[in-house]
Amino acid sequence: MDVDRRLTHVELLHAPGERELAARAFALLGCTVSDSGRHWFTAFIDTNLRDYSNNLFYASEAPAEQLAIEAAMTDLGDEWVEMVRAAPQNSPHFGLRVGTVEEHRTIIDNIRNASENDVELRGRIEVLGLFPHDAPDAIATNMDQAFIWTNVIASGPLRLGQVIELQWHLNREPA
């Protein structure tokens, strides 16, 4: 199916000195990272495609102006992060769909492992909630959902972090 309208990319930021850590966060999400050493690097959502214009993430270092604003936020973000942890589905987020339930589970397991065992990622990335399609508290009955929080990459203030909804759909749409 040819589509004229689509989401082309999401631009995310990382803290100074954390470019490699940001690339690792994308890899944990199942993306393929390509870094040409320019201002930004690319993370492909579909690991089989190399379309630099569609269906991807870009990541670059947060500008000094943003970091100054974030420094002024002091403890104001702590309550926000706690709200996000309690109800991630009610926070600003974007969704990322994977192709198989096995891939969904593997990504979740890898993120949990990194959040517990990786010194650089402990406290920086975590699975906030799982909502299987057949659970009594399912948000959606047509997909399994996992909500992931990280402050390694974000499309807004790094201090507040980024919520990413990882989805596996029971029925794939026709191509």
Model features per residue range: what roles?
Residues 11, 18-20, 46, 61, ...:
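Glutamate identity and glutamate-enriched acidic tracts
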Residues 22-29, 106-115:
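Short amphipathic alpha-helices in soluble, non-transmembrane regions
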Residues 1-3, 5-17, 35-37, 43-45, 51-52, 72-112, ...:
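Vicinal oxygen chelate
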Residues 1-66, 129-133, 148:
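Core segments of cupin and vicinal oxygen chelate
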Residues 58-59, 95, 149, 167:
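Residues in well-ordered beta-strands of folded domains
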